[in-house]
Amino acid sequence: MYSKISILLLLAFMSISSMAQTVRNNYPNFQSPKRETRAVWLTTFANLDWPKTYATSPENIERQKQELITLLDQYQQANINTVLLQTRVRAATIYPSAIEPWDKCITGTEGKAPSYGYDPLKFVVDECHKRGMAIHAWIASMPAGSKRSLGARMLVQKGFKLRYLSTGAYLNPADSQVPNYLAQICGEVVRNYDVDGIHLDYIRYPDGWSSPTGRYGDTRDDRRTQITNIVRAIHDQVKAIKPWVKMSCSPIGKYADLNHYSSKNYNGRDRLSQESQEWLRQGLMDQLYPMQYFRGTNYYPFLADWEENKHAKEIVSGIGTYFLDPREGNWKLNEVKRQMNVSRDLGIGHAHFRSAFLTNNKQGILDFEQQFNAYPALPQALESKQQTVAAPSYCKDNDLIMSEDSNTKQLAWEGISPYYNIYASKTFPVDITKAENMVYAKFSGKMLTLKNPYQQHNIHYAITAIDRFDNESIALQERSRTTASAHSAMLSNDGITLELPCKMVAFKARYYTVETLQGNIVRQLSGTPKGNTVSIIGLPNGMYKLKAMYPHSKFASNIGFFFVNN
């Protein structure tokens, strides 16, 4: 039997051939998944990605905002759904913090706030949510900037004993003050902003730090424990404030040496005390974005290792998109295509490092991203204590379609969820399990005006609610324009009893099942109904599918659909 690593390597190197590449070019048209994290790191350090204009006047603030809008519009066109925004840069922030100073990337001056009530972080959060994108606050954990930076000097004033290396100043992970301090910063962000995640970067011992002495308090295990304690403090703070906020980090791309593949003495666990797979197992992380900026056997075996040790959490492969630039590595585009394709084959999302190399369309990477992500996708859902998400309901006109003319169609609904997904299809009921039927993901309103191409005849619509944990409700299907064939498959009910077709009753099923359109069984009904009806008391409003299991049959038979609207 082939190992997962062997299969991955076979997939990767097969895709080098021209024939396999032709197949891969068509891949997005029929394999774009409904749930997948598609992310980009948006770097504010040294103004690398954004902003390019300092917010020193009303006009410049508007330019800074427009730069951000342009980037987000490019992401949206490529169906990217997650933005990792560098929020704590180097012991300095891009928001008004009560703990640390302003980073100079916003106004050009350390410690100087922008005027005119402008809050860059709030602006990015709002603009991301307008586009249905998740926004994660990227926190650079250990770096404190240069020795003379304002952030580093303020840390010294607070009693931190920084370590100074050739690359700058760093917090000491062994310092007992560090876990609570970083937790306070993350708590401040989560408490004051509607972010969807906290993303920890450089949550490890820095490069260039002396090796463990082996004496008490400074062994490899001690160092791993110190980093894990920092992660735990941040996790506990964040989840206590908003349990739906996703915890993630960007670990070194190789966790440890593998049986047949060496990390070449540079890995997270043994070299830098970063036990990220253990954080998944303990529930301290919801996602990992390993920085896999490698090729060939330095990439694919380690990708498989991340997937095999994800402990029912989520892995998002960090792609070294910057290597497409001749000044950085001069990779060929096919290398990145292969990595993205193989990651998707394995059910793994992808994240581009970093934004400028994607949006500048190096070697056509943005064009490929748009093809690869043929349809919108939802992020992976978190587990929550809430059993079901309340479905949306009709407005007073008892239908989704409020008005339509030759140019537009207006949909409207009611509900209590923060976001909604809109689906469209030529078949009824709309199958919400198919990514190609999704028109909008995580739409924040309750009314939508559609223009071309969704105003043609014979297009049907459905709405689902999505909660803060990214769990989805059953669908609210439109009622006004179902075809005759669709009506014939609809089963009559009054919200209490469901009427079965007489011919179905005669076949004497062993039992019936009621399923959501996602295929989840929500109720099993007796195969010996009273007359030709069965009870459906207590089913929430929405569209359902009825199936029957007959004697001597291995598979359930579709009976029809019914709609509950109490």
Segments from the language model and where they lie:
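Active-site-adjacent "subsite" loops/lids of carbohydrate-active enzymes
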Residues: 34-37, 43-65, 136-188, 192
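Pro/Thr/Ser/Gly-rich low-complexity, intrinsically disordered linker/stalk tracts
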Residues: 374-416, 470-487
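Beta-strand-rich modules
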Residues: 450-471
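C-terminal tail/sorting-segment detector
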Residues: 482-485, 543-566
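Polysaccharide-binding and catalytic clefts of secreted carbohydrate-active enzymes
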Residues: 80-81, 88, 131, 153-278, ...
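Catalytic domains of carbohydrate-active enzymes, especially glycoside hydrolases
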Residues: 63-92, 192-195
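Substrate-binding cleft of secreted/luminal carbohydrate-active enzymes
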Residues: 276-277, 281-299, 316-387
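Short, surface-exposed loop/turn motifs with a glycine/proline- and acidic-biased composition
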Residues: 455, 526-552
